[in-house]
């Protein structure tokens, strides 16, 4: 959607700005230092695919010696956003959030991101803030709504290999890996206008049981859930297991997905 530079109301000319989408950060460790950030590919997809202004949302705590961000990043402030994006990440959600006591990958977690993402997903759905989630983000959406994850898909014989080739270059890792079947008359199928599409695959975990209030939007050939959405039509909340931000402008489904997200964000922006 193209936005005008200004709007004329009667005799008054009002400056017109783009909607704002919050992007949840990872905590990246570099020696003794910690940084809060999100990949450039996600920022570009929000800015150019959804046609919105991306702002970064730091993780819940910025270190044990500092205050929790919840002291000033509260529900009222979050409610001023026009949309929120939960990107992929090398980290995994800590399994105690979905009822598993032991982690199969104890060195792969980002506790601070868990502390931001899980409550913010619930808040976004409660306030009707449009939400898009990719890879880990989709898993967070499922866990936030009470669902469970497979911790290691590759240890279950019924699943194909969903991880990327670690020996390949970056382009090779993000190449199309398998087809997904979109649920007939589902949100994703309606956005794309077809019932299947090829996607990339770079994940070792996946949805085991579906969270409450969610519905399946796509399956992999092995039956693994690849996309979900909120049943409540008043809340645009969709998660995909693949990485739609990669070459988003060249992939039909990715282009359509970010445009649909941007359109919903714009509707909220105009209602303020």
Model-derived regions, located:
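N-terminal beta1-alpha1 cap of cysteine-dependent amidohydrolase-like domains
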Residues: 1-132, 143-147, 154-192, 198, ...
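Conserved G/P- and acidic residue-centered "switch" motifs that form tight phosphate/ATP-binding loops
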Residues: 135
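The feature captures the ABC ATPase H-loop/switch
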Residues: 138
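A short, structured beta-strand/loop element
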Residues: 234-236
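Active-site-proximal beta-strand elements of phosphoester/diester hydrolases
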Residues: 238-241
């Amino acid at each position: 959607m193209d936005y005008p530079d200004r709007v004329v109301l009667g005799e008054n000319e009002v400056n017109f700005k783009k909607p704002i989408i919050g992007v949840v950060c990872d905590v990246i460790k570099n020696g003794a230092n910690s940084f809060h950030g999100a990949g450039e590919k996600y920022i570009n997809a929000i800015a150019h695919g959804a046609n919105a202004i991306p702002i970064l949302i730091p993780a819940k705590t910025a270190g044990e010696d500092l205050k929790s961000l919840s002291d000033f990043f509260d529900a009222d402030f979050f409610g001023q956003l026009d949309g929120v994006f939960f990107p992929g990440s090398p980290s995994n959600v800590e399994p105690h959030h979905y009822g598993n006591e032991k982690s199969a990958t104890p060195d792969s977690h980002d506790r601070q991101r868990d502390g931001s993402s899980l409550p913010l997903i619930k808040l976004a759905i409660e306030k009707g803030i449009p939400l898009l989630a990719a890879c880990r983000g989709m898993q967070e959406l499922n866990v936030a709504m009470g669902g469970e994850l497979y911790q290691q898909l590759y240890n279950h014989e019924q699943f194909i290999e969903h991880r990327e080739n670690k020996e390949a270059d970056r382009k090779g890792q993000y190449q199309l890996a398998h087809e997904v079947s979109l649920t007939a008359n589902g949100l994703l199928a309606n956005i794309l206008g077809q019932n299947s599409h090829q996607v990339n695959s770079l994940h070792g975990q996946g949805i085991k049981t579906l969270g409450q209030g969610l519905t399946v939007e796509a399956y992999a050939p092995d039956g693994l859930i690849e996309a979900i959405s909120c049943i409540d039509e008043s809340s645009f909340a969709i998660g995909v297991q693949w990485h739609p931000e990669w070459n988003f402008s060249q992939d039909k489904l990715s282009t359509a997905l970010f445009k649909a997200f941007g359109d919903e964000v714009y509707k909220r922006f105009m209602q303020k």
